[in-house]
């Protein structure tokens, strides 16, 4: 730390690089790669790719959030914490919490539910098609109506997937707001 309680240049650079890298990764995974892969790969191949990428993605998000929280927390004067500093710390703590929930709890449950779904689908000859390529009635909708086990597995998968998506969006929003906070605190551009 430099004289006067200001973080050194290296600390500032590391904080900004880790935060912007995490946010960029989150933007890419959330809004680009998932949609491109979903529209271009067979369903089960898409699921396999996601099951390999997401553990790394969530753990990297968790690690980046931890590093950023440690950097910011070490720079704060805790006795004289301002509302602005507290809100920035809260955003990073929220990001760390949500990334940890995804990395350590939701990802494994979502993937297990997906594998169970895919097992039933493979038994029925489904999963090899690219989404949107099927003509006629939806075989997955028919399967839900015919097989209560499949319907229950699908509900379980979408419950975990929905919670994971909410946590991911929370991380993305927290990091984006923290980046905006850093930008607003800049004196020069």
UniProtKB/Swiss-Prot annotation:
Subcellular location: Membrane
Membrane association type: Multi-pass membrane protein
Keywords tagged on the record: Membrane, Transmembrane, Transmembrane helix
Family classification: Belongs to the TMEM205 family.
Annotated protein name in UniProt: Transmembrane protein 205
One Pfam match: DUF4149
Top-level lineage group: Eukaryota
Species per Swiss-Prot/TrEMBL record: Bos taurus (Bovine)
Gene Ontology CC, one term: membrane
Primary location class: membrane
Parts of the chain that traverse the membrane: 18-38, 53-73, 81-101, 166-186
């Amino acid at each position: 730390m430099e004289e006067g309680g200001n973080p050194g240049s290296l600390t500032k650079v590391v904080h900004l690089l880790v935060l912007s890298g995490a946010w960029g990764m989150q933007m890419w995974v959330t809004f680009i790669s998932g949609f491109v892969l979903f529209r271009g790969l067979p369903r089960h191949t898409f699921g396999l790719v996601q099951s390999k990428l997401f553990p790394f993605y969530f753990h990297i998000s968790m690690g980046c959030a931890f590093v950023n929280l440690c950097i910011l927390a070490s720079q704060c004067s805790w006795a004289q914490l301002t509302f602005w500093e507290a809100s920035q710390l809260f955003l990073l703590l929220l990001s760390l919490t949500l990334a940890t929930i995804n990395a350590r709890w939701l990802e494994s449950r979502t993937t297990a539910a997906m594998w169970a779904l895919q097992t039933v689908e493979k038994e029925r000859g489904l999963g090899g098609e690219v989404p949107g390529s099927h003509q006629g009635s939806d075989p997955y909708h028919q399967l839900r109506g015919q097989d209560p086990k499949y319907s229950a597995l699908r509900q379980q998968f979408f419950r975990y997937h929905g919670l994971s998506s909410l946590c991911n969006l929370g991380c993305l929003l927290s990091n984006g707001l923290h980046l905006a906070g850093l930008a607003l605190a800049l004196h020069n551009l």
